[in-house]
């Protein structure tokens, strides 16, 4: 996995994680999440994020996530975490045995903006392509790693220079540990 060759670092390392040359396995901890203020009024900033640093202005990062969600709101996906008030995440968020939400959250200056679409809970893996063009970004998803579809194009007010991006997983309710 090319990502692991770039010396990724943890923001809030999980208690249980396994890393080998081609995958990272995270056992999520209960009560972990990323969300900032909008609509619900609370802020959660304690999810583990495993990411690399870059000043490259033009790139794409492609990663496949596989997950075993069991509790409402379990999440696994990609993230760009700059600080607690400026970050992005895209993932599948488990809802129930029938549906889950494929979505993205953009947080600029401390306020989150969430966009979702419902998908089947039978889907247990997803590819993501995260692309940067200066301080503008695009997130795409794919079930087969070949045919990507756009989820969102967005701007990060604090994302013009050095950024950090990678993968994350969290469990706002129960978790595995």
Which stretches of residues belong to each language-model region?
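Extracellular glycan-recognition regions
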Residues: 1-177
């Amino acid at each position: 996995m090319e990502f692991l060759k770039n010396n990724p670092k943890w923001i809030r390392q999980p208690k249980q994680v396994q890393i080998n040359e081609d995958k990272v396995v995270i056992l999520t901890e209960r009560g972990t999440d990323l969300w900032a203020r909008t609509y619900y009024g609370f802020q959660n900033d304690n999810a583990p994020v495993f990411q690399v640093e870059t000043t490259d202005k033009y790139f794409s990062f492609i990663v496949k996530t596989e997950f075993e969600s069991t509790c409402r709101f379990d999440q696994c996906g990609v993230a760009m975490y700059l600080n607690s008030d400026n970050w992005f995440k895209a993932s599948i968020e488990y809802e129930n045995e029938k549906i889950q939400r494929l979505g993205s959250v953009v947080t600029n200056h401390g306020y989150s903006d969430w966009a979702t679409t419902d998908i089947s809970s039978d889907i247990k893996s997803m590819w993501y392509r995260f692309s940067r063009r200066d301080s503008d970004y695009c997130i795409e998803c794919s079930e087969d790693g070949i045919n990507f579809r756009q989820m969102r194009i967005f701007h990060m007010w604090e994302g013009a220079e050095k950024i950090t991006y990678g993968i994350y997983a969290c469990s706002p309710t129960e978790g595995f540990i």
